[in-house]
């Protein structure tokens, strides 16, 4: 019985091997967000929806197996539009899905991002990359991460997390300059964001 209880209490330690979000703003991004806060506050909600083009990049094994399907990408796009339409923001696919068949990147290491994305990014759109798994440049397994303005127009996603109905919305929120509710750090320490 004691062994069973020990296993029961140790299970949660091993059950959380992946952090949800790998997005941590740089000081430059924090300064930019602070400087542009008033412009964002004054954005007129009565305007036509803000249309944001998306280029979806699905990374698969070299033999074309794995990766998200067209139906999966449709789910992601519908999820984004459902969550953001009340903020007068609408997303659309600017081109067909870019399938990247390369087993070297199927399980993604954030240290390879600059080289890999330089070959695939499309300018002036949000590039969303879907990998089998994502390890951030700090070595943590994450569901995804994005860049605050004025960073790269890019979101990196673990494919399974992209389909959970919330992580892609969360990461696009960072792209749109939203902090975590606990402030600009990715720790449990809270920074007060309300005056």
Labelled PLM ranges:
Residues 3-17:
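Sec-dependent N-terminal signal peptides
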Residues 18-126, 130-134:
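Propeptide-to-catalytic entry region of secreted or membrane-anchored zinc metalloproteases
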Residues 74-77, 154, 169:
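Extracytoplasmic/secreted envelope proteins and their assembly/folding machinery
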Residues 118, 132-151:
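Catalytic zinc-binding patch centered on the HExxH motif and its immediate surroundings
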Residues 151-161:
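Glycine-rich adenosyl-nucleotide cofactor-binding module
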Residues 161-195:
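The catalytic-center signature of Zn2+-dependent metalloproteases
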């Amino acid at each position: 019985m004691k062994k069973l209880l020990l296993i029961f209490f140790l299970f949660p330690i091993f059950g959380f091997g992946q952090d949800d979000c790998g997005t941590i703003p740089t000081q430059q991004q924090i300064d930019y967000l602070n400087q542009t806060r008033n412009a964002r506050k004054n954005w007129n909600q009565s305007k036509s929806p803000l249309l944001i083009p998306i280029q979806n990049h699905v990374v698969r094994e070299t033999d074309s197996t794995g990766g998200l399907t067209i139906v999966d990408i449709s789910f992601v796009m519908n999820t984004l539009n459902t969550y953001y339409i009340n903020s007068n923001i609408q997303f659309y696919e600017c081109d067909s899905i870019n399938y990247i068949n390369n087993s070297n990147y199927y399980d993604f290491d954030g240290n390879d991002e600059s080289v890999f994305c330089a070959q695939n990014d499309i300018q002036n759109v949000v590039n969303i990359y879907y990998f089998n798994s994502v390890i951030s440049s700090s070595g943590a397994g994450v569901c995804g991460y994005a860049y605050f303005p004025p960073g790269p127009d890019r979101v990196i996603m673990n494919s399974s997390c992209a389909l959970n109905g919330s992580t892609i919305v969360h990461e696009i929120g960072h792209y749109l300059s939203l902090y975590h509710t606990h402030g600009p750090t990715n720790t449990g320490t809270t920074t007060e964001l309300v005056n």
